Amino acid sequence: MNDPDQSGDAGTKGIDARKAALALLRAVLERRRPFDEALAQTPALNDLSTRDRAFARLLVASVLRRLGQIDAALDHCLDRPIKPKDLILRQILRLGAAQLLFLGTPAHAAVSTSLELARGPRHAGQRGLLNAVLRRLAREGEALVAAQDDARLNTPDWLWEPWCAAYGEATARALAAAHLREPPLDLSCKESPDRWAKTLDAEILPGGSLRLAAGQGEVARLPGYGEGAWWVQDAAAAVPARLLGDVAGKTVIDLCAAPGGKTAQLAAAGAEVIAVERSENRLKRLVENLERLGLGAATVAADAAAWQAPAPAEAVLLDAPCSASGTLRRHPDIAHLKGPKDVAALSAAQDRLLANAVTMVKPGGLLVYAVCSLQPEEGSERIARLLSEHQDLERVPVAPAELPGMTDAITAEGDFRSLPCHWDEGGGLDGFYACRLKRR
């Protein structure tokens, strides 16, 4: 049931890590800020050691991954529901429960540090409840967790129901299980993957990506980062650009291009890339990434749904904004911050982007549409609608030889559909959908 505790220190530093975790959890669940954004903007994290910062992140990620289980266990141990105005108490209980149930923290450390978080007049009269609930959880938690349906509890309806409809309940359960694990770190190399695999003690995956075990710490400290030898990119995220084939010497338009992993792929393959991104801040990050890698691309700050290309291109790649439900392993906040209304709004935006992207493709050229989403509404359903409206487009099915080691991810229609439970024993994949189209 438990994972190894990464911060057994229940002293001052342990308290500081948990205070930072509380601030981070509140930023996500109360102020509804994305996990990565909250990580970057929580001042309490800055003063922690690397080890304690990693623990604070792991603790909050564990709460977000297992929120359904944690809340069910807490509700079992509470005589009456916590009042809505006592949200901070609920967050402290969640952090304590995650340590007791899933991180292997000794009960005395989990309870005492949780009580320390509840000091002050705001929590007058609450410390007794906090102590009683967590001590009961320490006694009964193992049996409670063993009896839980973790897959169903941890997966909100807006995800569970479409997954069951699209993939079947067994696969939906496998997806939920995959989302509980920290993902490995995948890299794309500019060149010499064999050399960097040896230097980084990494596995070379069938598509050429490098895979390192989870828990590598700060990416910028790894060999090769400073010299621009590689960039972080999940193995599944590297597939859409590869579906364009040999792009050397060709003009390729990369729409919604930031943060630039696919732009880097295309530039490294010899393409003349035009990278279009609506957000100037994200475009700035893309340029910085390309500069680190020693790669070049023309960049345009514009809305890809309205921008007009200077001339039709031989290839267009559209990695559209989406719910990102395929990246829950890395972004567990998504399950709690998004919902059906977001998927509907994003689907409409994807239709607008696709309609404009088609106009940028010259006859005989290719369009690849991709989303890091598991929701059919954002993937195959968007392509079905596009094809119904454009007789000048035809699907170009993906051949098994194009995706060594990933043939299970090729759909009956010939599209690419990776799932987090693919390559499960080897660390899994992000959930991606990609379809390749040709303009007649």
Feature-to-residue mapping (PLM):
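S-adenosylmethionine
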Residues: 1-440
